[in-house]
Amino acid sequence: MDRLKHALGEATGWLLFLSFLMLVAVALPPQVFDPESKHFIMLIGLIGVWRYSMGIIHFLRGMLFLYVVYPYYRRKVEKLGKDADPSHVFLMVTSFRIDALTTGKVYGSVIKEAINCGYPTTVVCSIVEMSDELLIKSLWEKLDPPDRVKLDFVRIAGTGKRDGLANGFRAISRHMPDEDAVVAVIDGDTVLNEGVVRKTVPLFQDLPQHGWPDHQRILRSAGRLRHERVAQVRFAQRHINMCSMALSHRVLTLTGRMSVFRAVVTDPEFIVDVENDNLDHWRLGRFKFLTGDDKSSWFSLMRLGYDTFYVPDASIHTVEHPPEKRFVKASRKLMFRWYGNNLRQNSRALKLGVQRLGWFTSVVLFDQRVSMWTSLLGLTVAIIGSIKYSIAIFIAYLLWVCSTRLVLTLLLSLSGHPIGPAYPLILYYNQIVGAVVKIHVFFRLDQQSWTRQDTKLNRELASFQSWFNNWSSKAMTFSATSIFIAVLMLSV
């Protein structure tokens, strides 16, 4: 019955969306489609060749990797058999201020994977609360793993995830792992699906210079449906983009949910990079990275000469807890953290150079810097054009948005993700609101905060420096936005 209700709800949603699309098409004045009309010429200019060409390239590369290249790697590893087995597997989980129900699910799945994978395995628990330790010990006794599976606790002070990771890495280094050992870093809200370890770690034998993230999906139990839908759209887009970048062995992030490394994590230089990462900014000065440990680990691997890869058939579930009950406020908070981490990495990643990153990766990193403006180009021109000329321009833009987001939604389904009638709206919401948040955070890279706990970066600056950073950020945001709008008003 629930499945029938869901199917009827989805069908109703699609009918409403398609009906709205037809109404917009009917409301569109015929002269908009006249090639002689200046409105038609303007509409063509709104398409945004750069943005859509990058999207098409990512999609084609992603499908090539997903259905051709990755299956080739998988077949090669399967032929190796036992020769692809690692000498030891370390499953390190970091937990802080996560509810007991989620913690139980996470550690239960990790211990089961340690038992079922068949490799010598050590579960490393980087935890703060004694209650977590007691819960893990009770799960350990209940599941009763064999002698080849060990348990190692690392108690941390609760000063942040970076310290938890660094202490966990040092605990692993004390085991003195050899070069064939593999380390999986797992977030405290990540539930491992069955077989994820066996699907992942053997690939290192064929790709000896890699550390990579695993594919992720969302668990519906921890948030409202609209939060879940947004996360599903984001994961579907990330899935295609990661497949595209994996074609160049340059996946641009080692997702904090689950990443797998060679024992390079025991390198003191790598540990310091994760624990005490910082950025020197020409206006804001030097500041530490509070969030974005996954970006720090990616940058460190790139700098140390390693490559990154993606395993699309190794799935995990994440228990997502929205930071706010209100959808818009929660999404803004999450975007502020995501895009802040992205831009803080981006500003220095390009300095690694084309020889290290490759041409395509360098172009993608550049696109990340300009996409905050190109994403707003169509909407801004449509508003200006409708004010200066005719409301028909905005109606044409609305039709274009609905049509293209419908096509994008259908393309997302080719990645193996389910789609729904809300996806076109969510795609556009993410584009516009995401671009605005990105512009805001671009001029405030020193402002960082966690969404799970109320922790913010306190730089303890002198009063003048704090005042200067605050007002210069506002001034630069206003100036950049004014120039953007002025150029478009003169061009339209």
From Swiss-Prot:
Pathway terms, separated by semicolons: Glycan biosynthesis; alginate biosynthesis
Q: How does it sit in the membrane?
A: Multi-pass membrane protein
User: Which key words tag this protein in UniProt?
Assistant: Alginate biosynthesis, Cell membrane, Glycosyltransferase, Membrane, Transferase, Transmembrane, Transmembrane helix
Q: Which domain of life is it from?
A: Bacteria
Indicate the enzyme's highest-level EC class.
transferase
Q: Which Gene Ontology terms cover its molecular function?
A: hyaluronan synthase activity
Which Gene Ontology CC terms are recorded?
Answer: plasma membrane
**Keyword Cell cycle included in the entry's annotation:** no
Q: Where in the cell is it found?
A: Cell membrane
- Read off the InterPro entries from this record: Nucleotide-diphossugar_trans
Q: Which GO terms describe its biological process?
A: alginic acid biosynthetic process; extracellular matrix assembly; hyaluronan biosynthetic process
Query: What are the TM regions of this chain, as residue ranges?
Result: 13-32, 47-69, 379-401, 421-443
This protein's major location comes to membrane
Task: Write down the EC number.
Answer: 2.4.-.-
Give yes or no: UniProt keyword Glycosyltransferase.
yes
What the record says about family reads: Belongs to the glycosyltransferase 2 family.
Explain the purpose of this protein: Possibly a processive enzyme that polymerizes GDP-mannuronic acid.
Q: Specify the protein name.
A: Glycosyltransferase alg8
Q: What is the lineage of its organism?
A: Bacteria, Pseudomonadati, Pseudomonadota, Gammaproteobacteria, Pseudomonadales
Chain's gene name: alg8
